[in-house]
Amino acid sequence: MLRKLVTVIALATTPAWAAQASAPFTGADYSGRYECTGQDKHIGSYKGVVDMALDAKQSTGKYAAYTFTLTLEDKSRYDGMAAGTSDALGVYFAHTDPVLKDFGVGVAQMTSTPEGKVSFVKYYYTPEYEGGGHGLEHCVKS
C-alpha cells in the first residue's frame, strides 16, 4: 500500500517540463572549417584548423551543442565539445594523447570579420599541462 502511494505521489508531482519534447533548434549554426592562429603560454605562436559540427540531436531552441577537432600544423589533434547560445560558446578540449594531460576549457566569442566571414576568438585555460597555462586563438571560417 505504501509503495503504491509513493508511486502515485511521484507521478503526480513530476514536472510538466519532464514530459515535453525538446524544441527544434532555432539558433545560429556555426558548423564548418575555420583557419586559426593562436598564442599559447607554452608553445608560443601556432596555426591550425578547427572542424566544427552542430550536434542537432542535442541542440534545442536557441541553445547549440557542437563537437569539434583542432588540428595543428604539426598534426597534433585536440577533440572537443562546445555549448552555447547566440554569439558565445563554452568549450572543452583534450589532446588525443592523454599522457600529455593537455586538456582545458575556454570561452569563444563569435563575431564577423570586416569582410563578413564568421569568426571567433577563444580564450582557454589548461590547468594540468606543464604546470598550467592559457592561450588565445583567432579563427576565421574558410
What residue ranges belong to the model's regions?
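Bacterial N-terminal signal peptides that target proteins for export
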Residues: 1-6
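Central antiparallel beta-sheet cores of small beta-barrel/beta-sandwich binding domains
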Residues: 20-142
